Amino acid sequence: MRVVVQGPGSLGSLVGGVLAGGETAVTLLGHQSEHLTRVREDGLRVVQPDGTTRVTRPSVATDPSVVADADLVVVCVKSYDTASAARALGRQCDGAMVLTLQNGLGNAAVLAEHVPADTVLVGTTTHGAARTEPGVVRHAGGGETTIGRYRGANDARVASVAAAFSTGGMETTVTASPQRAVWEKVLVNVGINAATALADVDNGALVECPPGERVLERAVTEGVRVAEAEGVSVSESVVERARQVAARTASNESSMRQDLAGGARTEVESLHGAVVERARDHDIAVPVIRTLADLVRLAQRDG
């Protein structure tokens, strides 16, 4: 299987390293950067949770035309870049499956505007990752990964993608309800990301002290009501799942914390903002989520 990972940030680099470690032919596609230069010259170093390091050697590309020969494109760009990434895929893809492993709501729908909807796969993962220096990504904690078709029934092609991830060490299951999985991942992110970014703490702080526990629980509980109003029946244990993810990735910096600390744009609009927008459609009050969203916007001076 020939795989292109579009967006070699923290998660994209981890995914590329996992797939390349399973002997899949992998290309990291991104803008020219010191990170890609280092990967091209020295390989991609994946630091495992136990401290050991695995070096893999994915190819590197900056020209989007590389996706023309791919069997699978894994989209890991930030959610605010989905539209531009989708347009590039629409011009270059030739029958490849397109898997979104992004944060937030609505990414698959945007991709399906530019590539055939029956080629779009919706994925979620709770694996933690952090790019610590050029050419190096730290696998900050294990998790669950699921994939499923955006439109239509799952088939052998979907199973082959799951097998490639599992072979590389990221155990992946196929689900018939990918949108439910997306919502549950969004709710976990809503419970963890903004709070850790604003308080400048690792994920584990949210389950180690009462204030963190309260914010996580209230935010996720608000989000559950919105998901149900949208017709998505999420697991009753999603609050506990958020706690488990925070505990399992206790030493990890959430992506929003990394972005805010580095002066980069966050994905608050596709996470907290998207939930607030849908809550407004159903006249549901989400004061904690709304406040978290506004505080992140204030911190990044955006809107």
Curated annotation (Swiss-Prot):
Major location (coarse): cytoplasm
Chain residues that bind NADP(+): 7-12, 78, 103, 129, 267
SUPFAM superfamilies registered for this protein in UniProt: 6-phosphogluconate dehydrogenase C-terminal domain-like, NAD(P)-binding Rossmann-fold domains
An individual GO BP term: coenzyme A biosynthetic process
Residue positions of the active site: 185
Reactions it catalyzes: (R)-pantoate + NAD(+) = 2-dehydropantoate + NADH + H(+); (R)-pantoate + NADP(+) = 2-dehydropantoate + NADPH + H(+)
Enzyme Commission numbers on file: 1.1.1.169
Any single Gene Ontology cellular-component annotation: cytoplasm
Keyword NADP: yes
Positions contributing to substrate binding: 185, 189, 193, 203, 252-255
Disulfide bonds, paired cysteine numbers: none
GO MF annotation list: 2-dehydropantoate 2-reductase activity
Subcellular location per the Swiss-Prot or TrEMBL entry: Cytoplasm
Presence of keyword NAD: yes
Keywords, comma-separated and alphabetical: Coenzyme A biosynthesis, Cytoplasm, NAD, NADP, Oxidoreductase
Pathways involved: Cofactor biosynthesis; coenzyme A biosynthesis
Pfam families recorded: ApbA (PF02558), ApbA_C (PF08546)
EC class (word): oxidoreductase
Function: Catalyzes the NAD(P)H-dependent reduction of ketopantoate into pantoic acid.
Family classification: Belongs to the ketopantoate reductase family.
Protein name, per record: 2-dehydropantoate 2-reductase
Lineage: Archaea, Methanobacteriati, Methanobacteriota, Stenosarchaea group, Halobacteria
